[in-house]
Amino acid sequence: MKDFNDKVAYITGGSSGIGLATAKALSTEGAHVIIFARKKDCLEHALEEIKSKRISSSQRFSCMTMDVSNWDEVQEVMFRAVAQFGVPDVLINCAGRAYPRVFEEINYEQFDETMKINFHGIWHTTSALVPYMKERGGYIVNVSSIAGFIGLFGYTDYSASKFAIIGFSEALRSELKRYGITVSVLCPPDTDTPGFHEENKTKPEETKAISGSAKLMQPDEVARALLAGMRKEARHIIPSFDGKLIFLLKRLLPGLVEFVMDSTIKKVQAKRGEK
């Protein structure tokens, strides 16, 4: 998609972080932006930020509360959105959560919630909108993570959900080409968002050591990289150099990647007196 001017963009998780940054970036490109999230007050505050970036008085903006993990609610909200704002040219599935901890500390309810928000949520919104979008084509971006192509200590549930997103997106890209719908998957690194700071409250020391070796990106940097990747219709959009390198090495030299990660983990555990 070369031009976002006058395009209708739906963004889940659009009230903060990468979703909000992307909404603002699209606003500066002349797009009509509709954001979705669970908290109405956060949505309304975000909407004012997005409107402030507009380049034309003809641009339309709105927000709608929605829990992406609730299939019935997604169907109902998306039906109303299409009736009010039209079929989206762009769907960006950005809603997600992470609550890092080691596998044995995760109960089933926590695992289920992570999968429902991160992966099922993408399936829900995509399923609700593809029947409309296939009539005229469009663009779908699903947000995964670097943890979607490399399993990380402390992220057994999160990595599982993000791996699923990549597989889903690659298969969907193949299926929807015939309808003129392009599908990309965004794999950002650690990004300076409210969610990232919440993660740090529960993140195991091993996880902090691994993630601390890479550059922390800003949401607007990720948003710029996303739009650039969409213009190229890239299959995988990986904003950081570190991420691109890991993506390549994981495929060519997986043993080396595992060795480096294991070495980092062992150093942290040795400091605690573990063997």
How should these model regions be labeled?
Residues 8, 15-17:
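Conserved glycine-rich cofactor-binding loop
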Residues 31-46:
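Conserved glycine-rich Rossmann-like NAD(P)H-binding loop of the short-chain dehydrogenase/reductase
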Residues 65-76, 108:
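The beta1-alpha1 cofactor-binding region of Rossmann-like NAD(H)/NADP(H)-dependent oxidoreductases
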Residues 102-103, 107-112:
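Substrate-binding pocket helix/loop in short-chain dehydrogenase/reductase
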Residues 126, 161:
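Active-site helix of classical SDR
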Residues 145:
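Residue(s) in the substrate-gating loop at a strand-loop-helix junction
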Residues 178-241:
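SDR active-site lid
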